[in-house]
Curated annotation (Swiss-Prot):
Belongs to the chaperonin (HSP60) family. It catalyses: ATP + H2O + a folded polypeptide = ADP + phosphate + an unfolded polypeptide. Its EC number is 5.6.1.7. It is found in: Cytoplasm. It comes from the Bacteria. This is Chaperonin GroEL. The gene is groEL. It is an enzyme of class 5 (isomerase). InterPro entries: Chaperonin_Cpn60_CS (IPR018370), Cpn60/GroEL (IPR001844), Cpn60/GroEL/TCP-1 (IPR002423), GroEL-like_apical_dom_sf (IPR027409), GROEL-like_equatorial_sf (IPR027413), TCP-1-like_intermed_sf (IPR027410). GO terms for molecular function: ATP binding; ATP-dependent protein folding chaperone; isomerase activity; unfolded protein binding. SUPFAM superfamilies: GroEL apical domain-like, GroEL equatorial domain-like, GroEL-intermediate domain like. ATP binds at residues 30-33, 51, 87-91, 415, 494.
Length: 548
Protein backbone atom coordinates (compact mmCIF):
# COMPACT_ATOMS: atom_id res chain seq x y z
CA UNK A 1 0.00 0.00 0.00
CA UNK A 2 1.33 3.46 -0.92
CA UNK A 3 2.43 5.82 1.84
CA UNK A 4 -0.04 8.54 2.83
CA UNK A 5 0.27 12.17 3.87
CA UNK A 6 -2.10 13.29 6.63
CA UNK A 7 -3.00 16.87 7.57
CA UNK A 8 -4.99 17.92 10.64
CA UNK A 9 -7.01 20.88 11.86
CA UNK A 10 -6.26 24.37 10.58
CA UNK A 11 -3.47 23.27 8.22
CA UNK A 12 -5.85 20.80 6.51
CA UNK A 13 -8.62 23.40 6.23
CA UNK A 14 -6.21 26.05 4.91
CA UNK A 15 -5.06 23.73 2.09
CA UNK A 16 -8.65 22.84 1.30
CA UNK A 17 -9.63 26.52 1.12
CA UNK A 18 -6.86 27.21 -1.44
CA UNK A 19 -8.40 24.58 -3.75
CA UNK A 20 -11.92 25.91 -3.17
CA UNK A 21 -10.84 29.44 -4.09
CA UNK A 22 -8.93 28.41 -7.23
CA UNK A 23 -11.93 26.52 -8.64
CA UNK A 24 -14.58 29.03 -7.51
CA UNK A 25 -12.59 32.04 -8.82
CA UNK A 26 -12.39 30.40 -12.26
CA UNK A 27 -16.11 29.55 -12.31
CA UNK A 28 -17.60 32.73 -10.84
CA UNK A 29 -16.29 35.04 -13.58
CA UNK A 30 -18.95 33.47 -15.87
CA UNK A 31 -21.91 34.59 -13.70
CA UNK A 32 -24.55 36.98 -15.03
CA UNK A 33 -25.31 38.60 -18.39
CA UNK A 34 -21.90 40.29 -18.42
CA UNK A 35 -20.07 37.13 -17.33
CA UNK A 36 -16.63 36.69 -18.88
CA UNK A 37 -15.47 33.82 -21.07
CA UNK A 38 -13.14 31.07 -19.89
CA UNK A 39 -10.80 29.42 -22.42
CA UNK A 40 -10.13 25.73 -21.80
CA UNK A 41 -7.23 23.89 -23.43
CA UNK A 42 -8.04 20.51 -24.98
CA UNK A 43 -5.50 17.70 -25.52
CA UNK A 44 -6.75 17.31 -29.07
CA UNK A 45 -8.17 20.05 -31.28
CA UNK A 46 -8.82 23.71 -30.65
CA UNK A 47 -9.42 25.17 -27.17
CA UNK A 48 -13.02 25.59 -25.96
CA UNK A 49 -14.42 29.01 -25.07
CA UNK A 50 -17.30 28.80 -22.61
CA UNK A 51 -19.48 30.75 -20.17
CA UNK A 52 -20.94 27.58 -18.66
CA UNK A 53 -19.86 27.23 -15.03
CA UNK A 54 -20.08 23.45 -14.82
CA UNK A 55 -17.97 23.03 -17.99
CA UNK A 56 -15.21 25.13 -16.38
CA UNK A 57 -15.47 23.25 -13.06
CA UNK A 58 -15.20 19.84 -14.74
CA UNK A 59 -11.85 20.76 -16.33
CA UNK A 60 -10.06 21.78 -13.12
CA UNK A 61 -7.63 19.32 -11.55
CA UNK A 62 -4.92 20.67 -9.20
CA UNK A 63 -1.38 19.36 -8.71
CA UNK A 64 -1.39 19.55 -4.89
CA UNK A 65 -3.55 16.64 -3.68
CA UNK A 66 -4.91 18.41 -0.60
CA UNK A 67 -5.82 21.54 -2.56
CA UNK A 68 -7.34 19.30 -5.23
CA UNK A 69 -9.64 17.70 -2.64
CA UNK A 70 -11.06 21.13 -1.83
CA UNK A 71 -11.56 21.89 -5.52
CA UNK A 72 -13.23 18.51 -6.16
CA UNK A 73 -15.68 19.04 -3.29
CA UNK A 74 -16.79 22.37 -4.76
CA UNK A 75 -17.02 20.68 -8.16
CA UNK A 76 -19.52 18.36 -6.46
CA UNK A 77 -21.64 21.43 -5.58
CA UNK A 78 -21.89 22.35 -9.27
CA UNK A 79 -22.71 18.75 -10.22
CA UNK A 80 -25.43 18.46 -7.55
CA UNK A 81 -27.10 21.70 -8.67
CA UNK A 82 -26.85 20.55 -12.28
CA UNK A 83 -28.39 17.14 -11.49
CA UNK A 84 -31.28 18.59 -9.50
CA UNK A 85 -32.27 21.56 -11.66
CA UNK A 86 -30.02 21.41 -14.75
CA UNK A 87 -28.74 24.94 -14.14
CA UNK A 88 -27.54 27.26 -11.36
CA UNK A 89 -24.08 25.69 -11.19
CA UNK A 90 -22.22 29.01 -11.05
CA UNK A 91 -24.58 30.44 -8.42
CA UNK A 92 -24.10 27.28 -6.32
CA UNK A 93 -20.30 27.59 -6.58
CA UNK A 94 -20.34 31.28 -5.59
CA UNK A 95 -22.59 30.54 -2.58
CA UNK A 96 -20.43 27.59 -1.51
CA UNK A 97 -17.23 29.67 -1.66
CA UNK A 98 -18.83 32.43 0.43
CA UNK A 99 -20.15 30.05 3.11
CA UNK A 100 -16.93 27.98 3.27
CA UNK A 101 -14.51 30.94 3.53
CA UNK A 102 -16.60 32.65 6.27
CA UNK A 103 -17.18 29.33 8.05
CA UNK A 104 -13.49 28.39 8.12
CA UNK A 105 -12.62 31.84 9.55
CA UNK A 106 -15.09 31.18 12.39
CA UNK A 107 -13.63 27.70 13.02
CA UNK A 108 -10.12 29.22 13.14
CA UNK A 109 -11.45 31.73 15.71
CA UNK A 110 -12.32 28.81 18.00
CA UNK A 111 -16.02 28.22 17.33
CA UNK A 112 -17.61 24.78 17.37
CA UNK A 113 -17.76 23.48 13.76
CA UNK A 114 -20.81 21.28 14.44
CA UNK A 115 -22.78 24.23 15.85
CA UNK A 116 -21.74 26.37 12.88
CA UNK A 117 -23.04 23.65 10.55
CA UNK A 118 -26.35 23.44 12.44
CA UNK A 119 -26.70 27.22 12.15
CA UNK A 120 -25.98 27.10 8.39
CA UNK A 121 -28.59 24.33 7.96
CA UNK A 122 -31.22 26.34 9.88
CA UNK A 123 -30.57 29.49 7.83
CA UNK A 124 -30.68 27.50 4.57
CA UNK A 125 -34.02 25.87 5.45
CA UNK A 126 -35.50 29.29 6.31
CA UNK A 127 -34.26 30.90 3.06
CA UNK A 128 -35.53 27.96 0.96
CA UNK A 129 -38.98 28.37 2.54
CA UNK A 130 -38.86 32.13 1.77
CA UNK A 131 -37.91 31.43 -1.89
CA UNK A 132 -40.85 29.03 -2.25
CA UNK A 133 -43.17 31.75 -0.90
CA UNK A 134 -41.82 34.28 -3.42
CA UNK A 135 -42.32 31.90 -6.39
CA UNK A 136 -44.90 32.87 -9.00
CA UNK A 137 -46.31 30.32 -11.47
CA UNK A 138 -44.60 30.33 -14.89
CA UNK A 139 -47.34 29.34 -17.30
CA UNK A 140 -47.41 31.76 -20.23
CA UNK A 141 -45.13 31.62 -23.25
CA UNK A 142 -43.69 35.08 -22.56
CA UNK A 143 -42.44 34.14 -19.08
CA UNK A 144 -40.98 30.85 -20.38
CA UNK A 145 -39.15 32.76 -23.14
CA UNK A 146 -37.76 35.23 -20.57
CA UNK A 147 -36.42 32.43 -18.34
CA UNK A 148 -34.81 30.73 -21.36
CA UNK A 149 -33.26 34.01 -22.50
CA UNK A 150 -31.71 34.72 -19.07
CA UNK A 151 -30.32 31.20 -18.73
CA UNK A 152 -28.85 31.30 -22.27
CA UNK A 153 -26.86 34.43 -21.33
CA UNK A 154 -29.35 36.94 -22.75
CA UNK A 155 -29.79 35.13 -26.10
CA UNK A 156 -33.39 36.04 -27.00
CA UNK A 157 -33.54 33.66 -29.99
CA UNK A 158 -32.87 30.68 -27.74
CA UNK A 159 -35.52 31.79 -25.22
CA UNK A 160 -38.09 32.22 -28.00
CA UNK A 161 -37.34 28.81 -29.56
CA UNK A 162 -37.66 27.01 -26.21
CA UNK A 163 -40.97 28.75 -25.45
CA UNK A 164 -42.24 27.88 -28.94
CA UNK A 165 -41.16 24.25 -28.53
CA UNK A 166 -42.91 23.97 -25.15
CA UNK A 167 -46.05 25.53 -26.59
CA UNK A 168 -46.12 23.01 -29.46
CA UNK A 169 -45.26 19.76 -27.68
CA UNK A 170 -46.63 20.61 -24.23
CA UNK A 171 -44.82 20.63 -20.92
CA UNK A 172 -44.51 16.83 -20.98
CA UNK A 173 -43.15 16.74 -24.55
CA UNK A 174 -39.60 15.75 -25.42
CA UNK A 175 -37.37 18.68 -26.42
CA UNK A 176 -33.89 17.75 -27.60
CA UNK A 177 -30.93 19.90 -28.63
CA UNK A 178 -28.87 18.97 -31.69
CA UNK A 179 -26.13 20.58 -33.76
CA UNK A 180 -27.66 22.31 -36.79
CA UNK A 181 -26.19 22.53 -40.27
CA UNK A 182 -26.46 26.29 -40.88
CA UNK A 183 -25.82 29.56 -39.05
CA UNK A 184 -29.40 30.06 -37.82
CA UNK A 185 -31.10 28.29 -34.91
CA UNK A 186 -34.08 26.20 -36.05
CA UNK A 187 -37.00 24.41 -34.41
CA UNK A 188 -38.25 21.13 -35.85
CA UNK A 189 -41.49 19.77 -34.35
CA UNK A 190 -42.79 16.24 -34.89
CA UNK A 191 -46.48 15.97 -34.06
CA UNK A 192 -47.83 12.59 -33.02
CA UNK A 193 -45.87 9.57 -31.87
CA UNK A 194 -42.48 8.99 -33.45
CA UNK A 195 -40.31 5.91 -32.97
CA UNK A 196 -36.95 5.06 -34.49
CA UNK A 197 -37.85 2.24 -36.87
CA UNK A 198 -38.10 2.69 -40.65
CA UNK A 199 -39.76 0.67 -43.44
CA UNK A 200 -38.62 -2.95 -43.81
CA UNK A 201 -38.49 -2.72 -47.61
CA UNK A 202 -37.92 0.27 -49.92
CA UNK A 203 -40.64 -1.22 -52.17
CA UNK A 204 -43.24 0.13 -49.72
CA UNK A 205 -42.29 3.75 -50.66
CA UNK A 206 -45.14 5.65 -52.33
CA UNK A 207 -43.74 9.20 -52.22
CA UNK A 208 -40.69 8.95 -54.49
CA UNK A 209 -39.80 12.63 -54.09
CA UNK A 210 -39.39 12.42 -50.30
CA UNK A 211 -38.55 8.69 -50.28
CA UNK A 212 -41.25 8.04 -47.67
CA UNK A 213 -44.31 5.86 -47.15
CA UNK A 214 -47.41 8.01 -46.53
CA UNK A 215 -50.75 6.54 -45.49
CA UNK A 216 -54.04 8.33 -44.91
CA UNK A 217 -56.48 6.80 -42.40
CA UNK A 218 -54.65 3.43 -42.20
CA UNK A 219 -55.49 0.34 -40.15
CA UNK A 220 -52.65 -0.63 -37.80
CA UNK A 221 -51.80 -4.23 -36.89
CA UNK A 222 -49.64 -4.64 -33.76
CA UNK A 223 -47.98 -8.03 -33.28
CA UNK A 224 -45.69 -9.13 -30.45
CA UNK A 225 -43.75 -11.72 -32.48
CA UNK A 226 -41.85 -12.35 -35.70
CA UNK A 227 -44.02 -12.89 -38.80
CA UNK A 228 -42.54 -15.16 -41.47
CA UNK A 229 -45.47 -17.42 -42.30
CA UNK A 230 -47.89 -16.07 -44.92
CA UNK A 231 -50.75 -18.36 -43.83
CA UNK A 232 -50.96 -16.57 -40.47
CA UNK A 233 -51.44 -13.22 -42.19
CA UNK A 234 -54.01 -14.21 -44.85
CA UNK A 235 -57.22 -13.80 -42.77
CA UNK A 236 -56.24 -10.25 -41.72
CA UNK A 237 -55.09 -9.31 -45.25
CA UNK A 238 -58.42 -10.47 -46.73
CA UNK A 239 -60.38 -8.32 -44.26
CA UNK A 240 -58.16 -5.29 -44.96
CA UNK A 241 -58.47 -5.74 -48.75
CA UNK A 242 -62.28 -5.66 -48.40
CA UNK A 243 -62.14 -2.41 -46.40
CA UNK A 244 -60.04 -0.68 -49.07
CA UNK A 245 -57.92 1.05 -46.40
CA UNK A 246 -54.09 0.93 -46.18
CA UNK A 247 -52.47 -1.32 -43.57
CA UNK A 248 -49.43 -0.71 -41.35
CA UNK A 249 -47.93 -3.78 -39.68
CA UNK A 250 -45.80 -3.21 -36.56
CA UNK A 251 -44.16 -6.48 -35.46
CA UNK A 252 -40.97 -7.83 -33.92
CA UNK A 253 -39.94 -8.54 -37.53
CA UNK A 254 -41.52 -9.44 -40.88
CA UNK A 255 -39.42 -11.58 -43.18
CA UNK A 256 -39.31 -14.35 -45.76
CA UNK A 257 -42.51 -15.34 -47.57
CA UNK A 258 -44.67 -12.96 -45.52
CA UNK A 259 -42.59 -9.88 -46.44
CA UNK A 260 -42.33 -10.92 -50.10
CA UNK A 261 -46.13 -11.28 -50.36
CA UNK A 262 -46.70 -7.86 -48.80
CA UNK A 263 -44.23 -6.25 -51.24
CA UNK A 264 -45.79 -7.96 -54.30
CA UNK A 265 -49.35 -6.96 -53.29
CA UNK A 266 -48.22 -3.40 -52.66
CA UNK A 267 -46.49 -3.14 -56.07
CA UNK A 268 -49.51 -4.63 -57.88
CA UNK A 269 -51.82 -2.20 -56.09
CA UNK A 270 -53.96 -5.02 -54.63
CA UNK A 271 -53.86 -3.09 -51.38
CA UNK A 272 -51.61 -0.51 -49.81
CA UNK A 273 -49.40 -1.95 -47.07
CA UNK A 274 -46.16 -1.25 -45.17
CA UNK A 275 -44.32 -3.06 -42.38
CA UNK A 276 -41.96 -1.77 -39.69
CA UNK A 277 -40.19 -3.36 -36.74
CA UNK A 278 -41.59 -2.64 -33.28
CA UNK A 279 -39.53 -0.10 -31.29
CA UNK A 280 -37.36 -1.13 -28.33
CA UNK A 281 -36.12 -4.53 -27.17
CA UNK A 282 -37.35 -7.18 -24.74
CA UNK A 283 -39.80 -5.98 -22.09
CA UNK A 284 -39.47 -2.39 -23.29
CA UNK A 285 -40.71 -3.47 -26.76
CA UNK A 286 -43.79 -5.11 -25.18
CA UNK A 287 -44.50 -1.91 -23.22
CA UNK A 288 -44.07 0.32 -26.29
CA UNK A 289 -46.35 -1.90 -28.39
CA UNK A 290 -48.96 -1.51 -25.64
CA UNK A 291 -48.43 2.29 -25.79
CA UNK A 292 -49.08 2.16 -29.55
CA UNK A 293 -52.21 0.05 -28.98
CA UNK A 294 -53.61 2.59 -26.51
CA UNK A 295 -52.71 5.50 -28.79
CA UNK A 296 -54.35 3.95 -31.87
CA UNK A 297 -57.31 2.29 -30.16
CA UNK A 298 -56.09 -1.18 -31.15
CA UNK A 299 -54.91 -4.32 -29.40
CA UNK A 300 -51.52 -6.08 -29.39
CA UNK A 301 -51.79 -9.58 -30.87
CA UNK A 302 -49.73 -11.49 -28.31
CA UNK A 303 -49.41 -15.25 -27.88
CA UNK A 304 -48.75 -14.62 -24.17
CA UNK A 305 -52.39 -13.48 -23.96
CA UNK A 306 -53.62 -16.54 -25.88
CA UNK A 307 -54.18 -14.60 -29.13
CA UNK A 308 -53.01 -15.55 -32.61
CA UNK A 309 -52.87 -13.85 -36.01
CA UNK A 310 -55.12 -16.46 -37.66
CA UNK A 311 -57.97 -15.80 -35.23
CA UNK A 312 -57.38 -12.05 -34.84
CA UNK A 313 -60.53 -9.98 -35.10
CA UNK A 314 -60.59 -6.85 -37.34
CA UNK A 315 -61.69 -4.90 -34.24
CA UNK A 316 -58.21 -5.49 -32.76
CA UNK A 317 -56.69 -3.23 -35.45
CA UNK A 318 -55.86 0.34 -34.45
CA UNK A 319 -56.32 3.40 -36.65
CA UNK A 320 -54.77 6.85 -37.10
CA UNK A 321 -55.47 9.80 -39.36
CA UNK A 322 -52.00 9.61 -40.94
CA UNK A 323 -48.77 7.60 -40.87
CA UNK A 324 -45.44 8.73 -42.36
CA UNK A 325 -42.50 6.30 -42.56
CA UNK A 326 -38.99 7.07 -43.80
CA UNK A 327 -35.80 5.02 -43.80
CA UNK A 328 -35.22 5.49 -40.06
CA UNK A 329 -38.42 6.73 -38.37
CA UNK A 330 -42.15 6.11 -38.20
CA UNK A 331 -44.60 8.86 -37.18
CA UNK A 332 -48.20 8.07 -36.22
CA UNK A 333 -50.35 11.21 -36.23
CA UNK A 334 -53.70 11.54 -34.42
CA UNK A 335 -54.26 7.96 -33.22
CA UNK A 336 -57.85 6.87 -32.56
CA UNK A 337 -57.28 5.95 -28.88
CA UNK A 338 -59.50 7.71 -26.33
CA UNK A 339 -58.08 10.56 -24.28
CA UNK A 340 -59.09 8.82 -21.04
CA UNK A 341 -57.16 5.62 -21.86
CA UNK A 342 -54.09 7.63 -22.96
CA UNK A 343 -54.18 9.65 -19.70
CA UNK A 344 -54.49 6.46 -17.64
CA UNK A 345 -51.47 5.01 -19.42
CA UNK A 346 -49.47 8.22 -18.87
CA UNK A 347 -50.29 8.15 -15.13
CA UNK A 348 -49.21 4.51 -14.99
CA UNK A 349 -45.83 5.32 -16.62
CA UNK A 350 -45.36 8.31 -14.29
CA UNK A 351 -45.86 5.99 -11.31
CA UNK A 352 -43.08 3.78 -12.75
CA UNK A 353 -40.83 6.87 -13.04
CA UNK A 354 -41.43 7.66 -9.34
CA UNK A 355 -40.41 4.16 -8.26
CA UNK A 356 -37.46 3.73 -10.67
CA UNK A 357 -33.88 4.21 -9.44
CA UNK A 358 -32.09 3.87 -12.81
CA UNK A 359 -31.36 7.12 -14.67
CA UNK A 360 -31.48 5.25 -17.98
CA UNK A 361 -34.90 3.72 -17.20
CA UNK A 362 -36.25 7.08 -16.04
CA UNK A 363 -35.08 8.73 -19.28
CA UNK A 364 -36.75 6.03 -21.41
CA UNK A 365 -39.98 6.21 -19.38
CA UNK A 366 -40.05 10.01 -19.74
CA UNK A 367 -39.66 9.60 -23.50
CA UNK A 368 -42.67 7.27 -23.52
CA UNK A 369 -44.75 9.81 -21.55
CA UNK A 370 -43.75 12.53 -24.00
CA UNK A 371 -44.64 10.45 -27.03
CA UNK A 372 -48.07 9.66 -25.60
CA UNK A 373 -48.89 13.03 -24.07
CA UNK A 374 -47.16 15.60 -26.23
CA UNK A 375 -44.77 15.27 -29.09
CA UNK A 376 -41.13 15.70 -29.97
CA UNK A 377 -39.36 19.00 -30.71
CA UNK A 378 -35.75 19.32 -31.85
CA UNK A 379 -33.87 22.62 -31.43
CA UNK A 380 -31.10 22.71 -34.04
CA UNK A 381 -28.34 25.06 -32.91
CA UNK A 382 -26.64 27.10 -35.64
CA UNK A 383 -23.15 28.60 -35.35
CA UNK A 384 -20.26 29.87 -37.45
CA UNK A 385 -17.56 27.57 -36.05
CA UNK A 386 -17.21 24.30 -34.16
CA UNK A 387 -16.03 26.14 -31.03
CA UNK A 388 -19.03 28.46 -31.08
CA UNK A 389 -21.32 25.48 -31.71
CA UNK A 390 -20.14 23.62 -28.58
CA UNK A 391 -20.40 26.71 -26.39
CA UNK A 392 -23.86 27.58 -27.71
CA UNK A 393 -25.15 24.02 -27.38
CA UNK A 394 -24.14 24.05 -23.69
CA UNK A 395 -26.05 27.31 -23.18
CA UNK A 396 -29.17 26.01 -24.93
CA UNK A 397 -29.08 22.85 -22.78
CA UNK A 398 -28.87 25.02 -19.64
CA UNK A 399 -31.73 27.20 -20.82
CA UNK A 400 -33.90 24.17 -21.56
CA UNK A 401 -33.35 22.76 -18.07
CA UNK A 402 -34.02 26.17 -16.51
CA UNK A 403 -37.34 26.57 -18.31
CA UNK A 404 -38.44 23.07 -17.26
CA UNK A 405 -37.54 23.98 -13.65
CA UNK A 406 -39.50 27.25 -13.97
CA UNK A 407 -42.61 25.44 -15.16
CA UNK A 408 -42.24 22.93 -12.32
CA UNK A 409 -41.80 25.24 -9.29
CA UNK A 410 -42.45 28.76 -10.63
CA UNK A 411 -40.17 31.78 -10.98
CA UNK A 412 -38.67 34.43 -8.70
CA UNK A 413 -37.01 37.79 -9.41
CA UNK A 414 -33.63 37.12 -11.06
CA UNK A 415 -30.19 38.66 -10.69
CA UNK A 416 -29.73 37.44 -7.09
CA UNK A 417 -32.69 39.57 -5.87
CA UNK A 418 -34.71 36.58 -4.57
CA UNK A 419 -31.93 35.69 -2.10
CA UNK A 420 -31.66 39.31 -0.89
CA UNK A 421 -35.44 39.49 -0.34
CA UNK A 422 -35.37 36.17 1.50
CA UNK A 423 -32.94 37.71 4.04
CA UNK A 424 -35.47 40.30 5.19
CA UNK A 425 -38.17 37.68 5.83
CA UNK A 426 -35.94 35.20 7.70
CA UNK A 427 -36.14 35.34 11.50
CA UNK A 428 -34.34 32.23 12.69
CA UNK A 429 -32.48 31.94 16.00
CA UNK A 430 -29.93 29.29 17.00
CA UNK A 431 -29.74 27.31 20.25
CA UNK A 432 -26.42 28.94 21.21
CA UNK A 433 -24.04 31.70 20.13
CA UNK A 434 -22.02 29.51 17.75
CA UNK A 435 -25.21 28.50 15.91
CA UNK A 436 -26.14 32.18 15.64
CA UNK A 437 -22.74 32.83 14.02
CA UNK A 438 -23.47 30.00 11.54
CA UNK A 439 -26.87 31.54 10.75
CA UNK A 440 -25.33 35.00 10.30
CA UNK A 441 -22.53 33.85 7.99
CA UNK A 442 -24.95 31.81 5.84
CA UNK A 443 -27.30 34.80 5.50
CA UNK A 444 -24.36 37.07 4.67
CA UNK A 445 -23.33 34.62 1.93
CA UNK A 446 -26.72 35.18 0.22
CA UNK A 447 -25.33 38.52 -0.99
CA UNK A 448 -22.47 36.83 -2.88
CA UNK A 449 -24.31 36.12 -6.18
CA UNK A 450 -25.56 39.71 -6.65
CA UNK A 451 -22.10 41.07 -5.73
CA UNK A 452 -20.51 38.82 -8.35
CA UNK A 453 -23.10 39.67 -11.05
CA UNK A 454 -22.50 43.38 -10.40
CA UNK A 455 -18.71 42.93 -10.32
CA UNK A 456 -18.69 41.06 -13.64
CA UNK A 457 -20.72 43.93 -15.14
CA UNK A 458 -18.13 46.48 -13.94
CA UNK A 459 -20.27 47.87 -11.08
CA UNK A 460 -19.33 48.07 -7.39
CA UNK A 461 -20.88 45.06 -5.62
CA UNK A 462 -21.34 46.68 -2.18
CA UNK A 463 -23.10 49.73 -3.65
CA UNK A 464 -25.46 47.53 -5.67
CA UNK A 465 -26.28 45.33 -2.64
CA UNK A 466 -27.09 48.38 -0.46
CA UNK A 467 -29.28 49.92 -3.17
CA UNK A 468 -31.18 46.65 -3.78
CA UNK A 469 -31.62 46.10 -0.02
CA UNK A 470 -33.17 49.56 0.29
CA UNK A 471 -35.87 48.56 -2.25
CA UNK A 472 -38.74 46.10 -1.89
CA UNK A 473 -40.35 43.29 -3.88
CA UNK A 474 -38.70 42.55 -7.20
CA UNK A 475 -36.64 45.79 -7.28
CA UNK A 476 -33.10 44.94 -8.38
CA UNK A 477 -30.08 45.65 -10.57
CA UNK A 478 -30.22 44.87 -14.30
CA UNK A 479 -26.55 44.04 -15.00
CA UNK A 480 -27.22 43.93 -18.73
CA UNK A 481 -28.17 47.63 -18.92
CA UNK A 482 -26.70 48.91 -15.63
CA UNK A 483 -30.16 50.16 -14.52
CA UNK A 484 -32.23 49.56 -11.38
CA UNK A 485 -35.90 48.61 -11.57
CA UNK A 486 -38.55 45.90 -11.30
CA UNK A 487 -36.77 42.68 -12.33
CA UNK A 488 -39.96 40.80 -13.18
CA UNK A 489 -41.24 43.67 -15.34
CA UNK A 490 -37.85 43.74 -17.11
CA UNK A 491 -38.16 40.01 -17.77
CA UNK A 492 -35.25 39.03 -15.51
CA UNK A 493 -36.54 35.84 -13.92
CA UNK A 494 -34.90 32.83 -12.27
CA UNK A 495 -36.61 29.47 -11.76
CA UNK A 496 -37.32 29.03 -8.03
CA UNK A 497 -36.10 25.43 -8.29
CA UNK A 498 -32.70 26.54 -9.64
CA UNK A 499 -32.20 29.13 -6.87
CA UNK A 500 -33.32 26.64 -4.21
CA UNK A 501 -31.18 23.76 -5.52
CA UNK A 502 -28.10 26.00 -5.81
CA UNK A 503 -28.42 27.08 -2.18
CA UNK A 504 -29.11 23.58 -0.83
CA UNK A 505 -26.17 22.06 -2.74
CA UNK A 506 -23.83 24.86 -1.58
CA UNK A 507 -24.89 24.62 2.08
CA UNK A 508 -24.62 20.82 2.08
CA UNK A 509 -21.01 20.68 0.84
CA UNK A 510 -19.99 23.78 2.86
CA UNK A 511 -21.24 22.10 6.04
CA UNK A 512 -19.13 19.01 5.29
CA UNK A 513 -16.00 21.06 4.62
CA UNK A 514 -16.36 23.22 7.74
CA UNK A 515 -16.60 20.07 9.90
CA UNK A 516 -13.52 18.44 8.28
CA UNK A 517 -10.77 17.79 10.84
CA UNK A 518 -8.28 15.62 8.91
CA UNK A 519 -7.29 14.98 5.29
CA UNK A 520 -5.52 11.91 3.89
CA UNK A 521 -3.82 11.78 0.47
CA UNK A 522 -1.20 9.65 -1.29
CA UNK A 523 2.30 10.84 -0.48
CA UNK A 524 4.17 12.10 -3.57
CA UNK A 525 6.59 9.51 -4.99
CA UNK A 526 10.16 10.82 -4.86
CA UNK A 527 11.88 11.25 -8.22
CA UNK A 528 14.14 8.30 -9.12
CA UNK A 529 12.80 6.10 -6.33
CA UNK A 530 12.58 2.46 -7.33
CA UNK A 531 14.61 2.93 -10.58
CA UNK A 532 17.84 1.16 -11.63
CA UNK A 533 21.04 2.21 -9.80
CA UNK A 534 23.46 4.63 -11.47
CA UNK A 535 25.73 2.78 -13.94
CA UNK A 536 28.63 5.13 -13.13
CA UNK A 537 29.52 5.89 -16.75
CA UNK A 538 31.22 3.58 -19.26
CA UNK A 539 34.90 3.30 -18.42
CA UNK A 540 37.70 1.69 -20.41
CA UNK A 541 36.86 3.30 -23.75
CA UNK A 542 39.95 5.51 -23.71
CA UNK A 543 41.89 4.18 -26.70
CA UNK A 544 39.20 4.70 -29.31
CA UNK A 545 39.70 7.45 -31.87
CA UNK A 546 37.12 10.24 -32.09
CA UNK A 547 34.23 9.70 -34.48
CA UNK A 548 33.71 12.20 -37.31
Amino acid sequence: MAAKDVLFGDSARAKMLVGVNILADAVRVTLGPKGRNVVIEKSFGAPIITKDGVSVAREIELKDKFENMGAQMVKEVASQANDQAGDGTTTATVLAQAIISEGLKSVAAGMNPMDLKRGIDKATAAVVAAIKEQAQPCLDTKAIAQVGTISANADETVGRLIAEAMEKVGKEGVITVEEGKGLEDELDVVEGMQFDRGYLSPYFINNQEKMTVEMENPLILLVDKKIDNLQELLPILENVAKSGRPLLIVAEDVEGQALATLVVNNLRGTFKVAAVKAPGFGDRRKAMLQDLAILTGGQVISEELGMSLETADPSSLGTASKVVIDKENTVIVDGAGTEASVNTRVDQIRAEIESSTSDYDIEKLQERVAKLAGGVAVIKVGAGSEMEMKEKKDRVDDALHATRAAVEEGVVAGGGVALIRALSSVTVVGDNEDQNVGIALALRAMEAPIRQIAGNAGAEGSVVVDKVKSGTGSFGFNASTGEYGDMIAMGILDPAKVTRSSLQAAASIAGLMITTEAMVADAPVEEGAGGMPDMGGMGGMGGMPGMM
